[in-house]
Amino acid sequence: MSSDEEKYSLPVVQNDSSRGSSVSSNLQEEYEELLHYAIVTPNIEPCASQSSHPKGELVPDVRISTIHDILHSQGNNSEVRETAIEVGKGCDFHISSHSKTDESSPVLSPRKPSHPVMDFFSSHLLADSSSPATNSSHTDAHEILVSDFLVSDENLQKMENVLDLWSSGLKTNIISELSKWRLNFIDWHRMEMRKEKEKHAAHLKQLCNQINELKELQKTFEISIGRKDEVISSLSHAIGKQKEKIELMRTFFHWRIGHVRARQDVYEGKLADQYYQRTLLKKVWKVWRSVVQKQWKDVVERACQARAEEVCIQISNDYEAKVAMLSGALENAKAEIQRMQHEKEHFEDSMKKAFMRGVCALNLEAMTIFQNRNDAGIDSTNNKKEEYGPGVQGKEHSAHLDPSAPPMPLPVTSPLLPSPPAAVGGASATAVPSAASMTSTRAASASSVHVPVSALGAGSAATAASEEMYVPRVVTSAQQKAGRTITARITGRCDFASKNRISSSLAIMGVSPPMSSVVVEKHHPVTVQTIPQATAAKYPRTIHPESSTSASRSLGTRSAHTQSLTSVHSIKVVD
């Protein structure tokens, strides 16, 4: 490009960021400037001009005056001259401004293509550069203006110059734009090549890594295959050796079996010979033994028979002595058992007598207690004491005089009152005082009297053995609400003394006092009408006594016997 062309070239406003740096954007800007100068400059009222003249006549006058003013005022400004000449060229620019604006509207909102090279071949540039409809419209408008208005040669020359400058500026702009596109395309191509090279290098590096990994894997596989080959070779060698061993063992065992069979045949022959020799020896030995047995059998039988007879005689003598001794012991035992049975019967009779005497005395004492408590029956009680008193005392005297009889329990006159001592059997016998306790309850059912009695019989060389037995029997009456019950519990403890006698070796045994419970139910006070009922106390009803006898014999001394008898009697006085 020359400097003159650059000097007179039209100014280009480049908006690379918004317009995309295209030729169509520059042309659009130039058209906008021309329209600006063509529309804003006139000073004519639009209403008057529209009413008096038609639209086709008014526009050229205004535009011609505007062009002359611009040319005289701004002759040095190329842009203004260009605009004035362009406007003075005819009214087709103004008329077709709307069509130009409509045609260039796609340029105002261009689509940025994906590639700068494609921008050069876009439809906008081709539409702006070569459009036959537009050229024809321009020529038609120019002919109309020329035919309508007379233009001077000077103005035509100026317009020609302006068009030349414009075409040169357009050429330079197009060339510069193409050079920019070329440079941009070269830069883009370089960037794409760089990216492709980087991708190619990365892919190549990846392939190299894969190749290295495959090489390492190949090495490991080769090593494993070599090891497997070694194992296979070693196993094949071992199998060959094992086959050789098996063949050797097979031949050895075949030889050994043959050898063992040969030895077995030899051994069997030897055994047959030995068996034959032994059978002959056995036959000879049996014959010799039979002869010897016949000779010695009689001698041995005689000796054994004599020895057996001696042993049998000795055993029979021993057993006869033992039988005689045991028969004597049996006779002694039978005599002792018979004697003990007689003693037992005598003891039972004495116990029954003593028990009856004690029960009678206790019943009389109980009746005296009832008579003392009731004021209405004092006379009948005194008469009964006078009637039965001497008999009781006579029984007591007879009991004291009889040495074999057991001691009688003393009557209880008042609670917690000791009884006087009594001599039993001889001077060495002493009586232990007895205590009686009586508890009376008036609330519901009964009152009870507990009388423990202990008697002691002693000898010069006797040891004491004590035993306490409690056998209570309580009989109450629930039929009469006003009745009272007195329960007397008697507990006796006796000490037996045994004395050895030289002549008869019999032991003197003490008699234990009876243990009994007497229950007397009284429903009404004792009066003259109840005396026949009180006489029943003399003959009480007897419950079957339970007696237990135990006898023991000591090993070193004669036998000592211990007997205990327990009896329970109850007397009921009922209306």
Swiss-Prot record:
Keyword Transcription attributed: no
Ranges of Basic and acidic residues composition bias in the record: 382-400
Modification(s) after translation: Hyperphosphorylated during recruitment to procentrioles in G2/M phase.
PTM annotation (N6-acetyllysine): residues: K538
Region (Disordered): 1-26, 376-411, 538-575
Bias type Polar residues, positions: 545-569
Residue ranges that the Swiss-Prot or TrEMBL entry lists as coiled coil: 191-222, 316-355
Superkingdom of this protein's organism: Eukaryota
Any one biological process term the GO annotation gives: negative regulation of centriole elongation
Gene Ontology CC entries for this record: centriole; centrosome; cytoplasm; photoreceptor connecting cilium
Alphabetic keyword roster: Acetylation, Cell cycle, Coiled coil, Cytoplasm, Cytoskeleton, Phosphoprotein, Repeat
Chief site of localization: cytoplasm
Compartments reported by the entry: Cytoplasm, Cytoskeleton, Microtubule organizing center, Centrosome; Cytoplasm, Cytoskeleton, Microtubule organizing center, Centrosome, Centriole
Record bears the keyword Mitochondrion: no
In-chain residues carrying the UniProt-annotated modification Phosphoserine: S105, S109, S564
InterPro entries: POC5
Start-end of each Centrin-binding (CBR) repeat: 142-173, 231-262, 263-295
Biological role: Essential for the assembly of the distal half of centrioles, required for centriole elongation. Acts as a negative regulator of centriole elongation.
Subunit structure: Interacts with CETN2 and CETN3. Forms a microtubule-associated complex with POC1B, CETN2 and FAM161A. Interacts with CCDC15.
UniProt record similarity statement: Belongs to the POC5 family.
Protein name: Centrosomal protein POC5
Species name: Homo sapiens
Gene: POC5
